[in-house]
């Protein structure tokens, strides 16, 4: 099916960022926001060649005049027209390849609805005429990237978090838990608590500034109460941040109050369990014989696990929940922001994987439902 000299394309479509590149590479070539922007105002300059939509970084840089939309919500594609624009942009503008010449590996959220993976398959073969494609579960790829086939992955991106127990390469669907609490919620929460400090951030464009503050300054406290007391009595944790207009703001306990919401979702007015309890609950839904392997191989993945201090805190919290003699190991690879993509790059370049691709011929014979038989 797949000639050795043609590299497969690996596209990891996240709620916040799209990561794309070539199988066999150790990092994605293109990383851009999963955004489609449309002008808010009527164009007045004739002959400016104004477009009716912008994708990715271009939408980001023109955000002041655009309405920004994310076609992927909570990890699942909700707007297919915009999604097609993002894929088109990925192939033709970012990677500069002809999709009809390369097999394409796409990623999907755990528990992605069946109709969604069929639609992805259909668009790849019918709109982009790919010779072959495959859909892989994101968390499974992260586990491969860490060099394991058994473990539990806590994957948290911009739109959704999941705990996915995996045994010998197979995700265990009955034990997967989804938490609609991720990067975007933390950004919104930071916007809210900065407002209490007297700084006002409201528009979609300003949210991007707050996201940057979060990425640069936030961290997870090992002990929240102790940290709050430290913050109240000294200015040691205060940091300053320069806004695009030159104004400088000071950020204090917001730095760790923001990601604390991962462990205490009640901060966001959510009823759900924190990420440590969710991970524990997910392990407890698995067969008693494999739990030991999961505790010892807890892998963090995704951009919202990049906060300094998160692995130590996770270790502390899970030790408190687990049986006393249990060996617990939290693995937080430095490249975990891209580990889904890296896992895809590894998988698509394995010689044993080459017979797993869904070919155009198989698609023409069976239709979109072929994806359920070949990708699991």
UniProtKB/Swiss-Prot annotation:
A GO CC annotation given for this chain: cytoplasm
Record keyword Acyltransferase present: no
Subcellular location(s) of the protein: Cytoplasm, Cytoskeleton
Catalyzed reaction equations: ATP + H2O = ADP + phosphate + H(+)
Enzyme Commission (EC) number: 3.6.4.-
Residues the record lists as N-acetylcysteine modifications: 2
SUPFAM superfamilies recorded: Actin-like ATPase domain
Record family assignment: Belongs to the actin family.
Main location: cytoplasm
Enzyme class: hydrolase
Modified residues (Tele-methylhistidine): 74
Cited Gene3D superfamilies: 3.30.420.40, Actin, Chain A, domain 4
N6-methyllysine modifications at: 85
Keywords tagged on the record: Acetylation, ATP-binding, Cytoplasm, Cytoskeleton, Hydrolase, Methylation, Nucleotide-binding, Oxidation
Xref: Pfam families: Actin
Identification of the protein by name: Actin, nonmuscle
Functional description taken from the UniProt entry: Actins are highly conserved proteins that are involved in various types of cell motility and are ubiquitously expressed in all eukaryotic cells.
């Amino acid at each position: 099916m797949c000639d050795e000299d043609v590299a497969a394309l690996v596209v990891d479509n996240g709620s916040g960022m799209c990561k794309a590149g070539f199988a066999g590479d150790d990092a994605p070539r293109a990383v851009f926001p999963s955004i489609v922007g449309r002008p808010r105002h009527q164009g007045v300059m004739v002959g400016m060649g104004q477009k009716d939509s912008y994708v990715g970084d271009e939408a980001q840089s023109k955000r002041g005049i655009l309405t920004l939309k994310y076609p992927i919500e909570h990890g699942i594609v909700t707007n297919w027209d915009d999604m097609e624009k993002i894929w088109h942009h990925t192939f033709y503008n970012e990677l500069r390849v002809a999709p009809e010449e390369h097999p394409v590996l796409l990623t999907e959220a755990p528990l992605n609805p069946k109709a969604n993976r069929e639609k992805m398959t259909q668009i790849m073969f019918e709109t982009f005429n790919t010779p072959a494609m495959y859909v892989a579960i994101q968390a499974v790829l992260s586990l491969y990237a860490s060099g394991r086939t058994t473990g539990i992955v806590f994957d948290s991106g911009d739109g959704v978090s999941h705990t996915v127990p995996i045994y010998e390469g197979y995700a265990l669907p009955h034990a997967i838990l989804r938490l609609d609490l991720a990067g975007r919620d933390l950004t919104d929460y930071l916007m809210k608590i900065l407002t209490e400090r007297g700084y006002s951030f409201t528009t979609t464009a300003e949210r991007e500034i707050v996201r940057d503050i979060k990425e640069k300054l936030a961290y997870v406290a090992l002990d929240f109460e102790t940290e709050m007391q430290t913050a109240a009595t000294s200015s040691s944790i205060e940091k300053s941040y320069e806004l695009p207009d030159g104004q400088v703001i000071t950020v204090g306990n917001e730095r760790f109050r923001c990601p604390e919401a991962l462990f205490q979702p009640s901060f966001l007015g959510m009823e759900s369990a924190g990420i440590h309890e969710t991970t524990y609950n997910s392990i407890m839904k698995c067969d008693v014989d494999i739990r030991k392997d999961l505790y010892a191989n807890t892998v963090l993945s995704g951009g919202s696990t990049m906060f300094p201090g998160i692995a130590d805190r996770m270790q502390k919290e899970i030790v408190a929940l687990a049986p006393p003699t249990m060996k617990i190991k939290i693995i937080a690879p430095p490249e975990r922001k891209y580990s889904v993509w890296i896992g895809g790059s590894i998988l698509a370049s394995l010689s044993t994987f080459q017979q797993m691709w869904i070919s155009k011929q198989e698609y023409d014979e069976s239709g979109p439902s072929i994806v359920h038989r070949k990708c699991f």
